[in-house]
Every structure is written in structure tokens, then in C-alpha cells.
Amino acid sequence: MARSIKKGPFVDLHLLSKVEAAREANDKRPIKTWSRRSTVLPDFIGLTIAVHNGKQHVPVYVTENMVGHKLGEFSHTRTFKGHSGDRKAAGRK
């Protein structure tokens, strides 16, 4: 179920204050955050936000298409190693 429109998008206040400070100072350094639950706002466009994936901070350059999504969607937490191949088919070739 989607979030109520009357509540508005959720953004952690510490992240919002860091974004506003970076905008005022015209700072292009990545903003480090652990807040995967925050919604991407139009103010974030053009900034690089380093989102924590549980192990490291993954730099995410925010574009116009990302507005309305959560930051955690762009920083994957699991590594897919691939399915094991068919052992019989590999031996025949």
C-alpha cells in the first residue's frame, strides 16, 4: 500500500540538512548516508549520495528519473553469484 498523499514523502531530517548545506556551498562531494528509507526529492537532482548497503557506501548520482523512489532501491544489498550450470551439458561439450 502506498503512502498517504497528505503525509508527503519521507526524508530523514539529517539527510535533508546535509543536502541543503551541499546546495548552498555548491559542494560536489558525495553525501554519506545510512538512510535507505528516504525518498528522493527534486532537490537531490545533480548530487551524489553515498548510500550504505550494509557493507560499504555505494555512490548514487541522482537523476530526474529517480525522483519519488527510495534511496535503497539504487544500492543493492545482495550479490548474485549466478546459478550453477548444468554439469551434464558442460561435460559433453
Swiss-Prot record:
InterPro entries reported in the protein's UniProt record: Ribosomal_uS19, Ribosomal_uS19_bac-type, Ribosomal_uS19_CS, Ribosomal_uS19_SF
A single cellular component GO annotation: small ribosomal subunit
Gene Ontology biological-process entries: ribosomal small subunit assembly; translation
Record's keyword annotation contains Hydrolase: no
PROSITE patterns cross-referenced by the UniProt entry: RIBOSOMAL_S19 (PS00323)
One GO MF term attached to the UniProt entry: rRNA binding
UniProt keyword annotations, A-Z: Ribonucleoprotein, Ribosomal protein, RNA-binding, rRNA-binding
HAMAP family listed in its UniProt record: Ribosomal_uS19
Role: Protein S19 forms a complex with S13 that binds strongly to the 16S ribosomal RNA.
Similarity comment text for this entry: Belongs to the universal ribosomal protein uS19 family.
Listed name of the protein: Small ribosomal subunit protein uS19
Organism of origin: Nitrosospira multiformis (strain ATCC 25196 / NCIMB 11849 / C 71)
